[in-house]
């Protein structure tokens, strides 16, 4: 995000479009750009946690430089309509970036089908080593300028100088390979277990709300709302369960 924005340097296109539910890895760079003169627009989501397409269509225009929308939300697991948003972006000559950190390793991710220009992943999200990630850059825009954030050697086509982390790169590649080998089989089983858990809870707890239940979600994520219950107090009374009150990461 910062590299694309720095290359434009407040030229004709100075609008960045993102959503209100992004990870801080997206929101904080966007806030930083806003403080330096960029027009940053935050898209709302509907009651299911899905980005409102009509809002996206309305704000993406000829001034838009980049649209950055996550592929899957890290709290609800809800999948976002990346393909449609990419279409809006490309109609106006803007680039589409998606943060796919939560999705890769859980569902099939096809950059050609999504029609994204930029896609970022992080290895530790799918049992790879910590401290290594990857950025996919569509071949169609590889000749365009993305400014580096640091300077030094010419590694990684000059975008990220520095000695390559070979063990991390190998680990990321192997983690991708292993995840791909079991993606469908494990996805079906985890989805079955998730649904079974939610069905049991719904039968026993009146007023329970499952966030994103009626839209496409990651199979491994369940976001639950318990009415009239303090979530932190509830967790303290269930020390043997791995639960969180916020981001799944």
Predicted regions and their residues:
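Pyridoxal 5′-phosphate
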Residues: 1-249
